[in-house]
Amino acid sequence: MRIMARIGVENSLTDVQQALQQQGHEVVTLNSEQDAQGCDCCVVTGQDSNVMGIADTSIKGSVITAHGLTTDEICQQVESRT
């Protein structure tokens, strides 16, 4: 059985949070840079470029910018990066 990833998702992306939870991932709401620690991957809106400092090296995983992507596309990117 595949181990599911711990995914940080920006607060406003509730549809993405729900979709990832349905896939079995552990979803953490990103309210600050500290919330991103320990996440395998983070999904941010891309609206406020690097407002929380998440685009830098504060996490070991990749950062996915949701801007312009559908929920399904975001979930596919999460799957390919975790």
UniProtKB/Swiss-Prot annotation:
Q: Write down the superkingdom of origin.
A: Bacteria
Q: Name one Pfam family in it.
A: UPF0180
The family classification in the record reads: Belongs to the UPF0180 family.
Q: What is this protein called?
A: UPF0180 protein BC_1394
